[in-house]
Amino acid sequence: MDRLLRLGGGMPGLGQGPPTDAPAVDTAEQVYISSLALLKMLKHGRAGVPMEVMGLMLGEFVDDYTVRVIDVFAMPQSGTGVSVEAVDPVFQAKMLDMLKQTGRPEMVVGWYHSHPGFGCWLSGVDINTQQSFEALSERAVAVVVDPIQSVKGKVVIDAFRLINANMMVLGHEPRQTTSNLGHLNKPSIQALIHGLNRHYYSITINYRKNELEQKMLLNLHKKSWMEGLTLQDYSEHCKHNESVVKEMLELAKNYNKAVEEEDKMTPEQLAIKNVGKQDPKRHLEEHVDVLMTSNIVQCLAAMLDTVVFK
């Protein structure tokens, strides 16, 4: 019986074959996406909702374990799906030539597309598109981003690469993990249903920011000194003042009532009297502070406008 298994080991379907020392595909590879590329992918994906959009990623293959994505650009296409026909070679060549003139000499390292609202995985059409990219470069990466499920502080994004079908037929282990970099992401049930770890595998995504990129991100929603002198509409400002004063009146009544009740309470009751309840004193102080600040700024801005633009 052992002899029969050894004889059939080298044939597909009859055994796993003799163990060899041939190197397997290593999944210690990481994709480093720049902040600019991530923002452009999310902006492009949100602009195309509810349609799928796609584009190409520019970067470099630093070594066997590092893929760096520096920039992306959108590809023109129409329809609900992303297919191979959506890659326009003429547009791609012209775009790369123009990017080289602006100091972007990087090569195409893969492509990205959006799945608005239904998670990160590769469909049959996406797998065919990825096959065409891997025919040009074996290390091409397919990035999927979900602009609907992405929120501030958590981007729903994943990177994939196809598994060689010949390895699966021969019964070989398609890949191995030999690194402790990054962390494992639990795959979603949708991705497992659509062939994750059977037809394609996930690659760890990391974000490496330099000092200039950190400054750029910090300045995205930074307020300037001019915004403090912006005049509000007078009717809206009066309505806001009126509503805040009404709230302050209710809070003052509640605070007066709470002070009267404190005289009749024991020290044990005083310690827990505000647990799970609104503290009228603290909220009253906050309302007074906000109301005074807004009115002072409004009056100051109105005076400056009168003096400067009279």
Curated annotation (Swiss-Prot):
PROSITE patterns: MPN. CDD domains: MPN_RPN11_CSN5. Widely expressed. Highest levels in heart and skeletal muscle. The keyword Zinc applies. InterPro entries: JAMM/MPN+_dom, JAMM_MPN+_peptidase_M67A, MPN, RPN11_C. Residues 31-166 form the MPN domain. One of its GO terms (cellular component) is proteasome regulatory particle, lid subcomplex. Its EC number is 3.4.19.-. GO terms for biological process: double-strand break repair via homologous recombination; double-strand break repair via nonhomologous end joining; proteasome-mediated ubiquitin-dependent protein catabolic process; protein deubiquitination; protein K63-linked deubiquitination; regulation of proteasomal protein catabolic process; response to ethanol; ubiquitin-dependent protein catabolic process. Zn(2+) binds at residues 113, 115, 126. The modification Phosphoserine is found at residues 150, 224. One of its GO terms (molecular function) is K63-linked deubiquitinase activity. A motif (JAMM motif) lies at residues 113-126. Keywords: DNA damage, DNA repair, Hydrolase, Metal-binding, Metalloprotease, Phosphoprotein, Protease, Proteasome, Ubl conjugation pathway, Zinc. The keyword Glycosyltransferase does not apply. The modification Phosphothreonine is found at residue 266. SMART domains: JAB_MPN. Component of the 26S proteasome, a multiprotein complex involved in the ATP-dependent degradation of ubiquitinated proteins. This complex plays a key role in the maintenance of protein homeostasis by removing misfolded or damaged proteins, which could impair cellular functions, and by removing proteins whose functions are no longer required. Therefore, the proteasome participates in numerous cellular processes, including cell cycle progression, apoptosis, or DNA damage repair. Belongs to the peptidase M67A family. PSMD14 subfamily. Component of the 19S proteasome regulatory particle complex. The 26S proteasome consists of a 20S core particle (CP) and two 19S regulatory subunits (RP). The regulatory particle is made of a lid composed of 9 subunits including PSMD4, a base containing 6 ATPases and few additional components. Within the complex, PSMD4 interacts with subunit PSMD7 through their respective MPN domain. Interacts with TXNL1. This is 26S proteasome non-ATPase regulatory subunit 14. The gene is PSMD14.
